[in-house]
Structure formats: structure tokens, C-alpha cells
Amino acid sequence: MRASGAVLTLLLATWGTSAAEPDENDSYFPIWGDEARARGYSIPLPYGVNLSYMNIRQDIMVDSITFSGLKLGNHPIPSDMFAIDAGHTREKSKTENLRLDMWVFPFLNVYGLVGHTRGSSVSQVSVDSDPSQFRGLDRAIAGAVHQLYQSGKLQDIDFKLDFKGTTWGAGFTLAGGYGNWFGLVDTNYTRTDFDILDGSISAVTVSPRVGYRFSFQGIDGPSHLSLWVGSMYQDVQQEFKGDLADLHMPPELQPLIAAVNKDGEGKFDVKQKLTSPWNMLIGAQYEVTKNFNVLTEFGFNDRNSFFVSGEYRF
């Protein structure tokens, strides 16, 4: 599952050359900004406040699902009793972020962000057990589970996890351009800590983009529309832990879990990652005024995403 993460953080540089667009600014930043303007480059105002929304739907690979702390009466059940196999898993998440950024150099922007992520994933799971691996009462329990599996009652069950939490992170953008063409590479680290469940989502994202900037007369002087294509790489590690009693168990699993978790001390641990780290991007940014712009971006292939933001620069 991803929230965040993932959490896309995009800053489109309005890099490009301009014949005669003096961009006076009293700020010390960006360093070497006056030199860049003297060479004919139009660069963004140094500071930015950005509000964004992102919606993601993507396929997930579940590495493991384990249950622990279970008992039948006073008899503890081994944590490896249940062999849980997860098939197709689909995750969806929504994230709202507030980002503050600054151009340190004309080619380098740094930023920090904080936000909120909520989402869910649905996995098709099958639960089995191997009686030959156990003795005594454990063998009898494993045999009963195996019979339920063979009957089909514990196969292809929809197992849903809901999550929400606070997302925070930081990153930087390298940007440059020639004529009206521009390129940038955005790199960031984000982490989502859950409000109810234990565990977290950590993501490292690298997004190269290349595009073209169109100039025209806007509502408040010269304006620009930028279009680009790119790709996104994400290295996401997701782990969900907590009490089994907090999960909304599917009807097929409720009798089994109720029998072995009467004291409510049962725990679960789910580890998973993305099936494909790469996806393609297309996007656009419209400079409404010198100080305000809006941006949207779509992702497709194995990860489908929609991103929209509004930004004030000063």
C-alpha cells in the first residue's frame, strides 16, 4: 500500500530563456539569480506555498501476512500455523499536502511537506495449514483449517485493510532549460505514520520530466503554459501491524478468528510493496499571474494517479 504514499511532490520550474523579461526581486535567494536573469533566463520567485491533492490507484505485491498471539482456550497457537497466501491486491489512497519551498540556486529548489493520507487495499487471500508440521492439539487445529481450505471456504477471500495517518517529508528539485524547453528531476522522501494501526509507509520517489513552455499575454501581463511528459520511480516499503480485533474481517474468516482470539490479544503483520516501481506521467501548469499558478498531472500504466495543486510564489 502506498500513501502517500506516496505521495507525489511536484515542483515545476518555470525555467526558460526570455528575450527581455526583467524579473527583479529583492530577496537574497536564489543565489546567482541576478546572473541568471542577466543571461536572459526567467526564473521563479524564490519562495512558494503549495496546497495539493493526489489520488492514486495501484497494484500491490503482498510479501507476507502473519497472525500471532492466538489461543484456543489456554492453548497458544504457533504463529506459523496459518499459511496465508495473498493473490491480486489493489490499493487506493488520497493525500492532501501543504508544501513550503525555496529556490536556493536558480537550478536547485528544496522543500518540506506535511499532509494527511487515507486509503485502503483489498487482497484476495487463501488460508491453509499443513497438519504434518504439528503434533497434538496443534495438528488437530491445522487439520481443521486444511479441511476448510480444501472445501473452498478459505480460498480467494477479500481481505481489506483501511489506513489513515500523517504524511511528512522533504525533497529537492534540479531544473534547467534551453530556449522554451525545460527539464527537471524531482527527488523526495516521505513517510506516513498511521493514526490507528501500527506501522508506516516509507517512500523514496524520483521523477524526471521534460517539457515545453509556451508564452502568451495573460490576465496580468506575460504568462506561460507548460506541458511535459515524464516518469516516476518509487521505492515503497509498507508495513501494517495492529490488533486483529481492529480489523473488519471478511465473513469467511470471522468464525475462525473468533475461536482463536477470544481474549482480543491476537496481532497481525502485513508487509507489502509495489508490483511495478515505474509509471508514466503527463502534466500541465498554467501561470495565472506572476505569483499564482495551478498545476495538474496524470499518471498511468500499473499506477494510475491524478494530481492537482495551487501555488503562491513570492
Predicted regions and their residues:
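Transmembrane beta-strands of outer-membrane beta-barrel pores
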Residues: 53-59, 114-120, 176-180, 187-193, ...
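Outer membrane beta-barrel transmembrane domains
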Residues: 228-314
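Transmembrane beta-strands of outer-membrane beta-barrel proteins
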Residues: 47-52, 106, 110-112, 181-187, ...
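Residues that define the transmembrane beta-barrel architecture of outer-membrane proteins
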Residues: 45, 92-96, 162-168, 200-206, ...
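Short glycine/proline- and aromatic-enriched beta-strand/turn motifs that initiate or cap beta-hairpins
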Residues: 19-92, 101-102
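Extracellular loop and loop/strand-boundary signature of outer-membrane beta-barrel proteins
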Residues: 36, 82-86, 153-160, 193-199, ...
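Residues on the lipid-exposed face of transmembrane beta-strands in outer-membrane beta-barrel proteins
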Residues: 51, 98-106, 112, 170-176, ...
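Short loop/turn motifs that connect adjacent beta-strands in outer-membrane beta-barrel proteins
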Residues: 21, 37-45, 102-107, 176-183, ...
